[in-house]
Curated annotation (Swiss-Prot):
InterPro entries: F-box-like_dom_sf, F-box_AtFBL13-like, F-box_dom, F-box_plant, LRR_At1g61320_AtMIF1, LRR_dom_sf
Organism field: Arabidopsis thaliana (Mouse-ear cress)
Protein name: F-box protein At5g03100
Domain of life: Eukaryota
GO CC aspect terms: peroxisome
Pfam families named among the record's database cross-references: F-box, LRR_At1g61320_AtMIF1
Domain spans labelled F-box: 8-54
PANTHER family hit by this protein: OJ000223_09.16 PROTEIN (PTHR32153)
Length: 307
């Protein structure tokens, strides 16, 4: 294979391992197209350790037929975005592919109604999992066993207190947890997650009312309607707090305003001894108003910065 103008095609002369690395950073749809370049490229993508699928205009049947040729025994990264209606068996096929090839990093984004099979919750290969489930309820009926999982990100998931507790019980090595716009959570108890060091909660009116997280070192907490009550964050060293400007729309009368000031004060009381605290403008505005109203605020021993 030569380039136009008679030059040598150095890329095709590279070892398979390097070509696999190149294709691993390419959407699977484009990686598959390289198979028509020459005989040298015909089977290269079959053993690429990463799959990235965006299913919006792609025909699922055609995609499944193509993926049936995928032969690598081990997947490092599996990323699927489904922004169109597909059938449950089609989703099952893609997830089973990831599970059967022992994928380590899995990212799934669904806008279809779907219920995960029990086999999804029993996996010793997963190290990083990100789920964006617009219409799905995450409610495992079996015992969860994600024994190698270290990073978990749940986005737009409907997950109850009992369900998150069951999930976390099966993640003994979990170090980082992100909850983004997840509803149905009231009490988030992370006291049994001994390895958890990082917690990020980005929410709206459905953010947890109470947070028990005695082992975390870093907390990012951005709420919409109200601050969460920090029951135990005794190991915390750094926090990032923010409130949406819309929070002021929900606290209009004098009694509600005083309640908001009290909740914000109680939050910062829990954080007065941490090494680094970053607060957003609305949060700072409420603190300043509370001080003007005679509310006693804690004295911070370390650095505070504003977003």
């Amino acid at each position: 294979m030569k380039r136009a103008g008679g030059g040598v095609d150095f890329i095709s002369s590279l070892p398979d391992e390097i070509l696999h690395h190149i294709l691993a950073n390419t959407p699977t749809k484009l990686a598959i197209r390289t198979s028509v370049l020459s005989k040298r490229w015909k089977h290269v993508w079959y053993e690429t350790p990463s799959i990235s699928i965006v299913c919006n205009r792609v025909d699922p049947d055609s995609l499944n037929k193509t993926l049936s040729s995928y032969s690598t025994p081990k997947i490092k990264s599996f990323d699927v975005t489904i922004s169109r209606d597909v059938t449950v068996p089609e989703i099952d096929t893609w997830i089973n592919l990831a599970l059967s090839r022992k994928a380590e990093n899995v990212s799934l984004r669904f806008t279809s109604h779907y219920r995960f099979r029990d086999t999804f919750f029993i996996n010793s290969s997963l190290k990083q999992l990100s789920l964006t489930l617009v219409y799905c309820i995450l409610n495992p009926k079996c015992v969860v066993s994600w024994s190698s999982l270290r990073n978990l990100s749940l986005n737009r998931c409907k997950v109850s207190d009992d369900s998150i507790a069951k999930i976390l019980t099966g993640c003994s090595l979990l170090e980082s947890l992100t909850l983004n716009l997840c509803d149905r959570l009231n009490d988030l108890d992370l006291s049994k997650s001994l390895s958890l060091r990082r917690l990020e909660i980005l929410g709206d009116r459905w953010t947890p009312e109470r947070i028990v997280a005695p082992h975390i070192r870093y907390l990012r907490l951005e709420n919409y309607q109200r601050p969460s009550t920090l029951v135990d964050v005794s190991s915390l060293t750094e926090a990032n707090l923010g409130l949406s400007k819309h929070v002021l729309d929900y606290f209009t009368c004098e009694m509600e305003t005083e309640s908001l000031q009290y909740m914000v004060r109680q939050t910062v009381v829990k954080l007065q001894n941490i090494k680094k605290l970053t607060i957003g403008g609305i949060f700072l505005q409420i603190l300043s108003l509370a001080e003007l109203c005679g509310v006693t605020l804690p004295v911070f021993q370390n650095s505070i910065s504003k977003l």
